[in-house]
């Protein structure tokens, strides 16, 4: 296999990562008339993960190595308004302290800003035993020039829409069904690279285009004992 073929060959990885952390959470809730307001703050979770690696052709996941993988702190605000006895509207805002969360190789320093989320939705009690809902979410990431991203794992700013239903199937049981769709924006990351081919070094300019779409269907059962 030539040097160029080696650089572009597939890589195999079999690695399990484990870790634990504690997250203190402070929250407040206030109700007045038809309004309900809430806020919470989740502290940054100091979190290390350890590699248990069986196969690693990438050279990035050495067995037994611990790496930082903190969960960022979150500041969230929300409000709900009772339009009628059966119709409710709500909105919320989330701010993630990504740049304060330690990551492998300190890649959080490549972010240009912290993540922000904007959410809004409606709930409607169609029948005493049936509630339907719909909502949307806008997520904005501060990705800077893209140095934070890699094809191993990535996120880009996104739009999401979702629909759901809650059905009472017994006095102490409720069936929940939900579907949501997320479209991630295109983000182009440009960089220069030197490739060895036929005994020579070739300088190339690359552009990686990151995007994806998620479609999720969820079903759950709530039981009160």
Give the location of each predicted region.
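Outer-membrane beta-barrel porins/channels
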Residues: 1-225
